[in-house]
């Protein structure tokens, strides 16, 4: 599957990955003193000049599988709770304000723990950090339904969200480092997997809860199985340090598992150790991307935490409300693959931002005036708007030239963005409790879409943070 994708994206590799770099698809060694490289179409591992393990075809496929499984686990902890929020509130005796605090925990954890991801990856390697993240997700999901009381529930939720935060930040970094000429395709692939995990948890949590006896505890705990499966797939990469990128990167593996060497044993141009730290806060594009990330995250976590309840309060059954939430999330499966590929072919991503924003405004307007009457249409429109997330991830990869730049930009944009998004779900809960309805919260959601469009257009301009930070 990855072979055909690579050929499509080769044209955009140089523009996307760096405007001053040479194309990565080289078939002969160009490094003085390096062994002669194999022909690009002859299967076989790259030379192990650096002492790291070669990227054999099965290892490349296992890495792709690990990325997909990790992405599937990045949202079920949140959407499964959204589907059963009313039952959890009743079971733990939560008020609307406390429930609003609960829905604000994800962005808070993402902001606090996400900033540590690049430092941990430099010390232990990204594979080890993602593996640890999957273990934390598994443990948190197993513990939280049975922790006893609101405090224990929040603490176990925070443990799972810590694992999600670390993996959130490192996914764009791993894609940029190991698949530099396939950023659009690989971003689309793991964004599809993320959307699939999000939607399946929203749709299946209520039916599985009923099948498991009608108690919300096992209905939430069952999602730990996904985390365990993902953790197993990352075990082979626990000892893969950052230097492995210079010894036969999977980015240079063809569709038949062939290895394309650009100088055996030569350091990669995007090796983090070779890049000086960026003064990322001097980049206007970095700030625009961070605010865009924060506003789309605000909309996403309000949707995941409250949308099912909005439909239920409008007279929709619990099962149907879960399906409507799933429709919103499942729209990301096809669109999360299409949007990054389209975005990498455009010099400016502003038109995509505008289309997504208009869909969001239309969906919120319908939800305000006829929440139950046009519920399925509003869900479709909000599902399209929700695809601002894969677009933001794609722009993270496009707005920096190097792997080190992507790591810093990803950590900055996500951590700052999630800090921005913290008040949103909490404010929705407070407005709902004190107004007694959903009119004011929906008006707030709609109003936030306007600045999201503005900063998204600014973030989509064709420039890099390295150039801006150097000024």
Positions of the model-derived regions?
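Helix-loop-helix hairpin linking two adjacent transmembrane segments in secondary transporters
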Residues: 181-182, 189-242
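A late C-terminal transmembrane helix in Major Facilitator Superfamily
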Residues: 400-438, 445
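Conserved MFS/SLC helix-loop-helix module at the cytosolic interface between two early adjacent transmembrane helices
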Residues: 112-151
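Helix-breaking motifs and short loop linkers at transmembrane-helix boundaries and internal kinks
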Residues: 93, 125, 146-151, 180, ...
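Cytoplasmic helix-loop-helix junction between adjacent transmembrane helices
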Residues: 156-194
